[in-house]
C-alpha cells in the first residue's frame, strides 16, 4: 500500500486507495451473515456441514491472522436448536453429562487438624475487617429444610451404606477438629476445642457435661429445687436433704469404693463444716435462706462447698446404681440443682475452663481431662433444628489423588432459586491490574494457607442455618464451609488484614488473593529470612501454613494464580497451551455441541486470550450459543481461527510503560459524509454509500484512518468508538474493527473542538483550540500496593 504524504492527504492516488478501503469496510458492515446465519436455527440442515471439513489444518494456519479472519466470512459457525447434542469436546464435558463419580470403598479420610486462630491477632493486626470476621454472620432470606435421613446424597446407590459410613467418619473428623457443632437437643450442641469469646456467654458448665441433656428434659419438673424439710414424716431422711433440723446438718460423704452415704453429725454453725479431704461438704444452698440467724457461713467456705457439690455431680452413674430410696432422691435433687444452675448465664473465671490441648495443672484430676475429651456444651441464643439445609457426598480428592476423599457440601439453595442471596463483592485484580502491581526484577516467595476456610468462625445463630447430616446425627458448621457464596468474601477479608500487617511489620511487598500470599523484596537473603519469620508469626496465632505448596526459598520464576511470573514478564505455562491445542484439534467440524460444553470451552479460551493476538469478539458466536442455550457447530474456517490464536503466543511485560502520544489525526462523520484531518493541515472528505447509524459511520472513519495513515492515536468525538464496545455490531465487522484498533490510543474531543468537524461542513480544519481526554477507565489499585 502506498504511504501518503502527510502534507497532501488530497492526492488523487491516495484518495483512490482510501475509497477502495472504505467500500470494503462498508460491504463488511452491510453483510447480513450475522443476522441470518448466526440466528438460532429450528433444525439441523445439510448446509451446516462445511465442505472443507477434511482439509488439513496446519497449511491454513500459516496465513496471517487478518487473512484467517476474512476467510471466516465465507464459512461462519452456526447456531442450532435445543435438541440433545455432543457433550464431549476433547477432555471437556458438558455439565449435564459429566463423568460419573466412582465410589471407592477404600477411600481414606484426609488428616484434618484443629484450626483455631487466636483472637489476640485482632490486637496484633489492627484492621476494620475483624468486625466482620469475629464472628462472621450468615443470614439467608429464607431456608428450605430437608429431613435428616436425606442428608447424604444418593450419589452411589449401590454403595449407599458404605457411603454413609465414610461420610460419618469424615464428619466425626471435622467435629474432632472443632469445625462442626454436634446436635444434642433443640437448644444444646457440643463442640471440641477452645471456645471463642462470643461463645463463652452461651456455654454450659463442663462440670455438668454429663447431665447437660437434662437441661431440656421436660420429664423432670423445672419447679423442683432444693427440697426443704416441710414433710410431716420427721424420720424420713430422704425428705430432708439439704435442710437443717434443730441444728443437725445433713452431709454427704463419698466412700472409698465410690458409693455415697448420708451422715447426721451434729455440728455447730460456727465450726468447720468441711469434711476430711474436702470430698464432702454441707449441701443446701436453700438452707441458709431458711435459717439466716443460725448459719453465718463465710464466703470462702461457701465457695469451697459449691466446688465440692460440683465434684459430686460429676459422678451420676454411681449415684444411680445405688438402689436405696434416699440415694435416688438425692440424685434427682442434684439433677434439679444442676438444671437450676445452668439456667443462669455462665461467666467463666480465670482458669476455670482449660483450653483443649493445654497442659496446666488440673486440681480436679483425670475427671476434668475426661470432660475435655467429651467437648464443651453450648446453649446458643437460637434453636438447633433437627433438619438439614445442605446435602453432602464424597468424591476423589482430585484427579491426581484418588486414594483420599473430599467432602462436597451442596448449599446451592442459598445461591439460586427462591432462596438466592446477593453476596457482597470484593476487589479482585484482573490481568491488567496484576501487571501493574507486581514489582519488576525482585525475588519472590509464595505462601499457601492450609484449610483456609476453616479459619473463619461463624456466629452460633448463623451456624444453625448450615446444617448437614450423615443420615443419623445432625451437625452444624462452626467454621465457614466452602459451599456458601459468602465464604470467599470472608476469606478475602481475612487474608487482606493479615497481608497488610505482614507488609508493614516485615517491610516486604505483600499481595494476598484468597489463600495465597506473594512476598517480594529486592534482597533474596532478606526475603529468605523474613519468610521464616512470617511463618512463625502466623503460626503463633494459630494460622496454619501448607508447607507442601509454599516456595521454600526465593525464586525468580514463580507460578502464581495460574501464571508463570518471571522478573520482567508473565506468561502461561506451555502445558496449558498444548492441552488447549489438543482440544481444538479434536473439534469435529459440522457436528452439534451442547452449549454447556461450549461454555466450558469459552472459559479456557478466555484465560489465554490476553496472551494471544486475538480479541474477545472472536468468541462472540459461542457466546450467542450460550446466551440462547442452543447447540453450536464449528466451521472449518472458525476452527482454523481458534487454532491460529494458540499459535501466536506472547508474554506480557510487567509494569508496562503507559505513553500518551500527541494526537496528529482527527476523524469525524455525519450520516452522509466522513472526514479525516491531519495536524499539518491536510484533510480528506468521503461520501458514504448509504445512510447508517451515526456510531457506525464514526467507526468506519476511524478504521479508515488507521488503515491509510497508521497513526499512534486518533481524535474522535464518538464516545462509542472510544469505549470499544462493539458487541452489538455485525460479527465480522466487530471482530475486524476490534483487531484493527487493539493497540491504538483513542482520545475523545468535543464536537466543537474536533478539527475534522470543519471539513464535514465544507470548512477548513482548525487545530488551534484542541481539547481532548482519554476515556479509558482508571485501574483501581489499593493504596498499600502502590508503593513499588
Curated annotation (Swiss-Prot):
Residues holding Mg(2+): 448, 515-516
Annotated region (Spacer), positions in chain: 201-370
EC number annotated for this UniProt entry: 2.7.7.7, 2.7.7.49, 3.1.26.4
All residue ranges annotated as the Reverse transcriptase domain in the record: 376-565
PROSITE patterns per record: RT_POL
GO biological process: DNA replication
S-S bonds: none
UniProt note on regulation of activity: Activated by host HSP70 and HSP40 in vitro to be able to bind the epsilon loop of the pgRNA. Because deletion of the RNase H region renders the protein partly chaperone-independent, the chaperones may be needed indirectly to relieve occlusion of the RNA-binding site by this domain.
GO molecular function: DNA binding; DNA-directed DNA polymerase activity; metal ion binding; RNA-directed DNA polymerase activity; RNA-DNA hybrid ribonuclease activity
Region (RnaseH domain (RH)): 656-788
Site positions for Priming of reverse-transcription by covalently linking the first nucleotide of the (-)DNA: 96
Segments of this protein annotated with the region Disordered: 230-381
Biased composition (Polar residues): 334-350
Catalytic function, reaction form: DNA(n) + a 2'-deoxyribonucleoside 5'-triphosphate = DNA(n+1) + diphosphate; Endonucleolytic cleavage to 5'-phosphomonoester
Residue ranges, annotated region (Terminal protein domain (TP)): 1-200
Keyword Hydrolase: yes
Alphabetical UniProt keywords: DNA replication, DNA-binding, DNA-directed DNA polymerase, Endonuclease, Hydrolase, Magnesium, Metal-binding, Multifunctional enzyme, Nuclease, Nucleotidyltransferase, RNA-directed DNA polymerase, Transferase
Biased composition (Basic residues): 293-304
InterPro entries: DNA/RNA_pol_sf, DNApol_viral_C, DNApol_viral_N, Hepadnavirus_pol/RT, Rev_trsase/Diguanyl_cyclase, RT_dom
Role: Multifunctional enzyme that converts the viral RNA genome into dsDNA in viral cytoplasmic capsids. This enzyme displays a DNA polymerase activity that can copy either DNA or RNA templates, and a ribonuclease H (RNase H) activity that cleaves the RNA strand of RNA-DNA heteroduplexes in a partially processive 3'- to 5'-endonucleasic mode. Neo-synthesized pregenomic RNA (pgRNA) are encapsidated together with the P protein, and reverse-transcribed inside the nucleocapsid.
Family affiliation: Belongs to the hepadnaviridae P protein family.
Free-text domain note: Terminal protein domain (TP) is hepadnavirus-specific. Spacer domain is highly variable and separates the TP and RT domains. Polymerase/reverse-transcriptase domain (RT) and ribonuclease H domain (RH) are similar to retrovirus reverse transcriptase/RNase H.
Protein name per the record: Protein P
Amino acid at each position: 500500500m502506498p504511504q501518503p504524504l502527510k502534507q497532501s492527504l488530497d492526492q488523487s492516488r491516495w484518495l483512490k486507495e482510501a475509497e477502495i478501503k472504505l467500500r470494503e469496510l462498508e460491504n463488511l458492515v452491510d453483510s447480513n451473515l450475522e443476522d441470518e446465519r448466526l440466528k438460532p436455527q429450528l433444525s439441523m440442515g445439510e448446509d451446516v456441514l462445511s465442505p472443507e471439513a477434511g482439509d488439513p489444518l496446519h497449511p491454513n494456519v500459516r496465513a496471517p491472522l487478518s487473512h484467517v479472519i476474512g476467510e471466516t466470512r465465507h464459512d461462519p459457525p452456526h447456531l442450532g436448536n435445543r435438541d440433545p447434542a455432543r457433550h464431549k469436546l476433547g477432555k471437556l464435558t458438558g455439565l449435564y453429562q459429566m463423568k460419573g463419580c466412582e465410589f471407592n470403598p477404600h477411600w481414606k479420610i484426609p488428616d484434618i487438624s484443629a484450626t483455631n486462630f487466636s483472637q489476640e491477632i485482632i490486637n496484633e493486626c489492627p484492621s476494620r475487617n475483624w468486625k466482620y470476621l469475629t464472628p462472621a454472620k450468615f443470614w439467608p432470606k429464607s431456608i428450605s429444610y430437608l429431613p435428616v435421613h436425606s442428608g447424604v446424597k444418593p450419589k452411589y446407590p449401590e454403595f449407599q451404606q458404605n457411603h454413609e459410613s465414610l461420610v460419618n467418619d469424615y464428619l466425626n473428623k471435622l467435629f474432632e477438629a472443632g469445625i462442626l457443632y454436634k446436635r444434642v437437643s433443640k437448644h444444646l450442641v457440643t463442640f471440641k476445642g477452645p471456645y471463642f469469646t462470643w461463645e463463652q456467654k452461651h456455654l454450659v458448665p463442663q462440670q455438668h457435661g454429663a447431665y447437660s441433656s437434662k437441661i431440656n428434659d421436660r420429664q423432670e419438673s423445672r419447679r423442683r429445687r432444693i427440697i426443704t424439710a416441710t414433710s410431716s414424716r420427721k424420720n424420713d431422711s430422704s425428705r430432708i436433704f439439704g435442710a437443717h433440723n434443730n441444728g443437725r446438718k445433713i452431709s454427704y460423704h463419698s466412700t472409698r469404693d465410690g458409693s455415697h452415704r448420708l451422715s447426721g453429725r451434729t455440728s455447730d454453725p460456727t465450726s468447720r463444716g468441711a469434711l476430711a479431704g474436702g470430698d464432702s461438704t454441707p449441701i443446701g444452698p436453700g438452707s441458709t435462706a431458711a435459717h439466716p440467724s443460725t448459719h453465718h457461713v463465710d464466703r470462702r467456705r461457701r465457695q469451697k462447698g459449691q466446688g465440692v457439690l460440683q465434684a459430686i455431680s460429676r459422678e451420676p452413674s454411681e449415684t444411680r446404681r445405688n438402689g436405696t430410696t434416699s440415694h435416688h432422691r438425692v440424685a434427682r435433687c442434684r439433677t434439679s440443682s444442676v438444671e437450676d444452675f445452668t439456667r443462669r448465664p455462665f461467666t467463666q473465671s480465670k482458669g476455670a475452663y482449660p483450653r483443649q490441648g493445654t497442659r496446666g495443672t488440673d486440681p480436679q484430676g483425670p475427671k476434668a481431662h475426661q470432660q475435655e475429651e467429651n467437648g464443651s456444651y453450648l446453649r446458643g441464643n437460637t434453636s438447633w433444628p433437627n433438619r438439614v439445609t445442605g446435602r453432602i457426598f464424597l468424591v476423589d480428592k482430585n484427579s491426581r489423588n484418588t486414594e483420599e476423599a473430599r467432602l462436597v457440601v451442596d448449599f446451592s439453595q442459598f445461591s439460586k432459586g427462591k432462596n438466592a442471596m446477593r453476596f457482597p463483592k470484593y476487589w479482585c485484580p484482573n490481568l491488567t491490574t496484576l501487571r501493574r502491581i507486581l514489582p519488576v526484577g525482585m525475588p519472590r516467595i509464595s505462601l499457601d494457607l492450609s484449610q483456609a476456610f476453616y479459619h473463619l468462625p461463624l456466629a452460633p445463630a448463623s451456624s444453625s442455618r448450615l446444617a448437614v447430616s450423615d443420615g443419623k446425627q445432625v451437625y452444624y458448621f462452626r467454621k465457614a464451609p466452602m459451599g456458601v457464596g459468602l465464604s470467599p468474601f470472608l476469606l478475602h477479608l481475612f487474608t487482606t488484614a493479615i497481608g497488610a500487617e505482614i507488609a508493614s511489620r516485615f517491610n516486604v511487598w505483600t499481595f494476598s488473593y484468597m489463600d495465597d500470599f506473594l512476598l517480594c523484596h529486592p534482597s533474596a537473603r532478606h526475603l529468605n529470612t523474613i519468610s521464616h519469620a512470617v511463618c512463625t508469626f502466623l503460626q503463633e496465632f494459630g494460622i496454619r501454613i501448607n508447607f507442601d505448596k509454599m516456595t521454600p526459598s526465593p525464586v525468580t520464576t514463580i507460578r502464581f494464580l495460574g501464571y508463570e511470573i518471571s522478573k520482567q514478564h508473565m506468561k502461561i505455562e506451555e502445558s496449558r497451551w498444548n492441552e488447549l491445542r489438543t482440544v481444538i484439534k479434536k473439534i469435529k467440524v459440522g457436528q452439534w455441541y451442547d452449549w454447556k460444553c461450549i461454555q466450558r470451552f469459552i472459559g479456557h479460551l478466555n484465560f489465554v486470550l490476553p496472551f494471544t493476538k486475538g480479541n474477545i469478539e472472536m468468541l462472540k458466536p459461542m457466546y450467542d450459543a450460550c446466551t440462547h442455550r442452543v447447540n453450536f457447530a464449528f466451521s472449518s474456517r472458525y476452527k482454523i481461527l481458534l487454532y491460529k490464536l494458540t499459535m501466536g503466543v506472547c508474554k506480557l511485560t510487567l509494569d508496562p510503560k503507559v505513553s500518551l502520544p500527541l494526537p496528529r489525526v482527527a476523524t469525524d462523520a455525519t450520516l452522509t459524509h466522513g472526514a479525516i484531518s491531519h495536524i499539518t493541515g491536510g484533510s480528506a472528505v468521503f461520501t458514504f454509500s448509504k445512510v447508517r447509524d451515526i456510531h457506525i459511520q464514526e467507526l468506519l472513519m476511524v478504521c479508515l484512518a488507521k488503515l491509510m495513515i497508521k497513526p499512534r492515536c486518533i481524535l474522535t468525538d464518538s464516545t462509542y468508538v472510544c469505549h470499544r464496545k462493539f458487541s452489538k455490531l455485525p460479527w465480522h465487522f466487530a471482530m475486524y474493527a476490534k483487531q484493527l484498533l487493539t493497540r491504538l490510543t483513542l482520545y475523545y474531543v468535543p464536537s466543537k473542538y474536533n478539527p475534522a468537524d470543519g471539513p464535514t461542513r465544507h470548512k477548513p480544519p482548525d487545530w488551534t483550540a484542541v481539547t481532548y481526554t482519554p476515556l479509558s477507565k482508571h485501574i483501581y489499585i489499593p493504596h498499600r500496593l502502590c508503593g513499588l
